[in-house]
Amino acid sequence: MATNFFIQPITEEAEAYYPPSVITNKRKDLGVDVYCCSDLVLQPGLNIVRLHIKVACEHMGKKCGFKIMARSSMCTYERLLILANGIGLIDPGYVGELMLKIINLGDTPVQIWAKECLVQLVAQGDHVPDHINILKRNQIFPLFAPTPRGEGRFGSTGEAGIMRT
């Protein structure tokens, strides 16, 4: 049934690339491409990349997690870029800005241009999204309400997930 992504720009830069709209996934693509919102230079080694957006996903009316996966264009003959953790797994309760850990495996810096898409979002369970809803920057939206998981990034809970006691 219905799977939807909700993308909210959190900076003025992101607003330029994500105008409020509802996009119907007519081609039934599994992944939702995500833009870089500014020009970047990725140095050799580990780089942290801000995406300037918050994202939520729901399936059948219930909030669900999603994955961040590299697009095939991220690693080419001209540039050797990978996501540091292979696939980013975003918990349903995470309500903060999306960020990437990208490793430049090359010996030289790599230029990334604004509006270039390096990654895509895939809904938990690999459900094909029906709609991508782009929200206004300061819009109050229930799926971004504070949660116990919150906005902490990159393993910030310091706990071992469902196995903790």
UniProtKB/Swiss-Prot annotation:
Q: What is this protein called?
A: Deoxyuridine 5'-triphosphate nucleotidohydrolase
Q: What is the role of the protein in this entry?
A: The viral dUTPase may play a role in lowering the dUTP concentration in natural infections to minimize misincorporation of deoxyuridine into the viral DNA and ensure the fidelity of genome replication.
How it assembles, according to the record, is: Homotrimer.
Which keywords does this chain's UniProt record carry? Early protein, Host cytoplasm, Hydrolase, Magnesium, Metal-binding, Nucleotide metabolism, Virion
How is this protein induced?
Expressed in the early phase of the viral replicative cycle.
Cofactor names from the entry are:
Mg(2+)
Please give the Pfam families that the UniProt record associates with this protein. dUTPase (PF00692)
Q: Which Gene3D superfamilies match?
A: 2.70.40.10
The record's catalysed reaction(s) read:
dUTP + H2O = dUMP + diphosphate + H(+)
- GO CC terms, sorted: host cell cytoplasm; virion component
Instruction: Extract the GO molecular function terms from the UniProt entry.
Output: dUTP diphosphatase activity; metal ion binding
- EC number(s): the record gives 3.6.1.23
Q: Which family does it belong to?
A: Belongs to the dUTPase family.
Q: Name one GO biological process term.
A: nucleotide metabolic process
Where in the cell is the protein located?
Host cytoplasm; Virion
